[in-house]
Amino acid sequence: MAMKLRLTRMGCKKRPFYRIVAMNSETRRDGRALEYLGYYNPMVDPAEIKVDGDKVRAWLARGAEPTDTVRALLQKAGV
């Protein structure tokens, strides 16, 4: 079972925000997440990124692979 750190879309039509979550790579995009790690809100200026660094490091230590987008967001957040 390959674990991924990825984004799930939340919010209403034309007003998205995203949760950064840990989930199985085979789970659908908005499926049940194993753990919520933070969020990303691109609708405010500047874009808001909040991440729990300890939880992210724990999942990376367990072998979870972040998607390219999540990797870029984590670098911006300084994790």
Swiss-Prot record:
One GO CC term, this protein: small ribosomal subunit
Keywords: Ribonucleoprotein, Ribosomal protein
Record Gene3D superfamilies: 3.30.1320.10
UniProt cross-references to Pfam families, sorted A to Z: Ribosomal_S16
Record family assignment: Belongs to the bacterial ribosomal protein bS16 family.
NCBIfam families reported for this sequence: S16
UniProt protein name: Small ribosomal subunit protein bS16
Gene: rpsP
